[in-house]
C-alpha cells in the first residue's frame, strides 16, 4: 500500500504526536509498505529519509500548550506537491483539526482519507475560528481513529464523526532492552521526570515541592528542554535523545507524571512501564486509563492532580516498600505490552483496508 502521512506539528521539537507518526511510519515500512511523511521541519532537524520537510514553523498556543505550526502559501505548495507526487492509495492525516499542514491537506485532498485524533480538549481560539470551515471538510474522512476514549468523546461531541479507538503505539522492546535488572541496581531510589520544564501543565514544580516533603535519600533526574533550576540533589540533564531517554528510564526506579491537564493519552507512561519503572501519575482520566487504575492489579499509582502532599505520600510509600514497587513494575510491564506497535499497527492497517477502494489520493 502507498501511504501518505501528514503531521501538523514541527519535527524541530520533540512531541508525542511527532514520535507516534515516525514510529508508525517505520513499522509500516518494515512491513513492506511505501510510506512518506509530510510535516513542518527545518533543514537542521535530523530526520529519516521518508520525511518530506515542510519548512519553517511558528510557536502558537494550541490545546493548552505551545505547538509549532506552519502557515502561508508555502504550506499549500508543499501539500500539493506531496499529494501529486506521492500517488498514495491512502492519506493518513493526524490532527485534522489543527490549522497547519493537516488542515490544508484535508481541504485539498480527495480520495481515501483516514484521520487520527490525538487531542482531547481545546479552548483554542484558532479552533473556534476554523470550526465552521472544519465541519464540512471532516465529512471527507472515510476512516477515523482516536488514540484514547477522551479524544474520541471530544471529537464526537464537538465536531461529529465516529472514530474507532486505537491507542498510541510504543516499541516496547527498545525500553525493555534498556531495563537494568533489579539485582544490579545500587544506591538510593532514583525518581525520573520527563517534560518541558517551562510548561506549567507538565507539573515539574509539583514534583519539586513534593520532594521537599520527602525525608528520604533519593536520586532525581529531570529530562526536558527549558530553564533548569538550581536544586540540590536534582540533576537537570536537558533534552535527551531517544537512546538516552531509554537508558535513564531503564536504570530508574520510579517515573513521575505530575501533569495537570491537556493530556489525552500519556505515551511516556507506557515507555516507563516497559523500561521497568514503577509509575506514579496524577489522576487525569487519560493517565488512569493507561494505568488501568480500576483493575485488581493497576499498573500505576495515582495521586490527586496538583497535590504535592498526595504525591509525596505515594512516593514515600514506594521508596520504603520495595515489594510494592516491584509489584507495580511487573504490572506495568504487562500493561505496556498491550500498547506494542505490533498490535497497534495491525489495527491501523485494518482501518486503511476499509477505505482503500482502488482510487488514488489526489489534490483538487
Predicted features and spans:
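Acidic anion/phosphate-binding donor-loop and adjacent secondary structure
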Residues: 153, 167-187, 231
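Conserved donor-binding/catalytic core segment of Leloir-type glycosyltransferases
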Residues: 182-202, 208-212
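A short, well-ordered alpha-helix in the C-terminal region of glycosyltransferases
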Residues: 317, 324-338
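Conserved acidic donor-binding segment of nucleotide-sugar-dependent glycosyltransferases
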Residues: 292-308, 317-322
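Membrane-proximal helix-turn-helix segments that form the acceptor-binding/catalytic region
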Residues: 121, 127-144, 150-151, 157-158
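Carbohydrate-associated surface elements
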Residues: 41, 150, 169
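Short hydrophobic beta-strand element within catalytic cores of glycosyltransferases
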Residues: 278-281, 288
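Acidic donor-binding loop of glycosyltransferase active sites
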Residues: 250-264, 277
